[in-house]
Regions:
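A charged, aromatic-enriched C-terminal amphipathic alpha-helix characteristic of glycosyltransferases
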Residues: 54, 58, 283, 287, ...
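Active-site proximal beta-strand in glycosyltransferases
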Residues: 77, 82, 86-106
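Membrane-proximal helix-turn-helix segments that form the acceptor-binding/catalytic region
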Residues: 106-128
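Carbohydrate-associated surface elements
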Residues: 131, 149
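Conserved donor-binding/catalytic core segment of Leloir-type glycosyltransferases
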Residues: 150, 156-175, 181-186, 194-195
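Aromatic "clamp/platform" in nucleotide-sugar-dependent glycosyltransferases that forms part
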Residues: 233
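Short hydrophobic beta-strand element within catalytic cores of glycosyltransferases
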Residues: 250-254, 260
Length: 336
């Protein structure tokens, strides 16, 4: 049986999750670990969230069992609490948000109690943000916070900003597209256009739907946008907001429940100069619209803003995350 330092059992159910799993595996490899990432096979689609999670948990268990039969890892990391629900053996749990927060009522009827047990039994928790621990009930299990790394995209900031505003709305209700559209209608000027990525819809004056995009094409749009605006009803991390900052795009957002890792940074909480790099407003059309207008009319030079934004996201850059993985996470994973 082959030896292995770390086995990561991932779901890979979304692009964002696959990217986060790849980043964790890459950080472990750069830290000198012999790490392997395996993913669950996508199950057939079912109608309810509770059954969907069961199908994914069973698929993750199968992937773990098959890999454990071939290798003897010193540590196992389950990527998401769903992957850990039916684990064949205990391991560290990597998660952005617990079912306690994003599976209310009947949607999490079986997941929440099993999740609480797994978070108690795990040797280590690896949340992406401290807010995820709070939402999980502040379990006493040892934890290491490891953010998702964010870097400027190829091309970076500095190009032509010929799109006034961009929003991402693959889940329009959760992302608050209705709020964004109402605010946009209240403040847009005749020559300004909002591009809606991740969704198809009827174009109208001032609003254009870009549909589903691959990630490189989306980041290319982001580099062209002056403002990224979002009004989420719940936010489990805020990776799109961090990517916007990485590409020098001004960010407008509303507060939202959930472990919204990007929100304190956007609001200037903890900043040395106390200055926010984003515009945070209530979701009413008047308040959100005023924030969008202020961001669009911001007189700060684009290059100066891009430098400030990059400095603000320093804790989320790959080099910082690699240090955390090498100095804090890996020693705890491999501790006898």
């Amino acid at each position: 049986m082959a030896s292995l330092d770390v086995l990561i059992v991932g779901l890979g159910s979304t692009h964002g999750l696959r990217a986060a799993e790849d980043e964790l595996a890459g950080s472990l490899l750069r830290a000198g670990a012999d790490a392997m990432l395996v993913r669950a096979e996508r199950p057939r689609e079912v109608r309810t969230l509770a059954l969907t999670d069961l199908m994914w948990a069973r698929a993750a268990r199968r992937a773990a069992v098959e890999s454990l039969a071939e290798a003897a890892p010193r540590a196992v990391v389950y990527s998401t609490t769903t992957a850990a629900l039916l684990w064949p053996q205990p391991g560290a749990v990597r998660f952005d948000a617990p079912a306690a927060g994003n599976r209310p009522g009947r949607h999490g009827v079986w997941q929440r109690p099993v999740e609480r047990r797994r978070l108690r039994e795990a040797p280590l928790l690896v949340p992406q943000d401290a807010g995820a621990l709070v939402e999980a009930g502040s379990p006493t299990t040892e934890s290491v916070i490891v953010p998702i790394p964010v870097e400027p995209s190829d091309g970076g900031a500095g190009g032509v900003r010929d799109i006034a505003a961009l929003t991402y709305a693959t889940n329009p209700y959760k992302k608050g597209l209705d709020r964004v559209l109402a605010a946009w209608e209240a403040v847009r000027r005749e020559d300004e256009e909002l591009v809606v990525a991740g969704l198809r819809g009827p174009d109208r004056p001032g609003v254009r739907y870009a549909g589903t995009l691959d990630h490189d094409d989306y980041r290319a749009l982001l580099r062209r946008a002056r403002v990224y605006v979002t009004a989420p009803r719940r936010e489990d991390y805020g990776i799109a907001q961090l990517e916007a900052l990485a590409d020098g795009t001004r960010v407008v957002t509303t507060p939202a429940p959930g472990p919204y890792a990007a929100l304190p940074l956007l609001a200037g909480v903890g900043a040395e100069d106390g200055a926010p790099v984003g515009w945070v407003a209530d979701p009413s059309p008047a308040a959100l619209g005023a924030a969008v207008r202020a961001a669009l009319d911001d007189a700060t030079d684009d290059a100066v803003y891009a430098d400030r934004a990059l400095a603000a996201i320093a804790p989320f850059r790959r080099a910082a995350v690699d240090r955390t993985v090498a100095e804090e996470l890996l020693p705890r994973l491999l501790r006898p």
